[in-house]
Amino acid sequence: VSQSQQPVVEMRDLTMQWGARPVLDRVSLVMQPGERLAVVGPSGAGKSTVLRLLAGLQLPTSGELRLFDRPQTYLRLDQTDPPDVRLVFQNPALLASLTVEQNVGFLLREQGQLTREEIRERVEACLEAVGLFDVAHQYPGELSGGMQKRVSFARALIDNPQRGDEAMPLLLYDEPTAGLDPVACTRIEDLIVKTTTVAKGCSVVVSHVRSTIERSAERVVMVYGGHFQWSGS
């Protein structure tokens, strides 16, 4: 079965416990290729825990988590070939001492498989895809907050050349529009949809902003009391 036909995410009876308290209690979820999902719920309900599990930053206490049909039994840093999961943080998390081009192309440079010119071309294409022009040689501190956020989206578009054409990333967005004014919110919401489409991936957005939930997702899951209380479009 090709990757494009397999579920991207499968959670089966998954439990995540802190001490004696289950944050997530025997939850199950399946995400198909191309799907855009929003995870909602009150503060402390476990929304961020869902993202951290999908990002490989934590392992479930029990139950099964599969990404791209591979069981996740090790933390991301302990895997030799981790799944293609890309996290866009609430704050852009850019390295201040590197230029925009160096930030966006960081992983490609570390892998050392492409020439500097090839990396530059890929970075330029990703920056243009998020509406940024002529900023490659600037530093994050020289950009507005909104532009920095766009740079973090461009970074999420960078593909690993080792992965084939069928590669389909899972993009995770943690409160991407928190603290933004309505106009900036709309731009970022459009960007979530565009970034996910351009990357040919699927996305999970954690948000409490109603417009973000409505505009950037086709399906919503509500986390409350350790359970996925309902799921719908």
Indicate where each model-derived feature is located:
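Catalytic Walker B motif of ABC-type/P-loop ATPase nucleotide-binding domains
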Residues: 166, 171-174
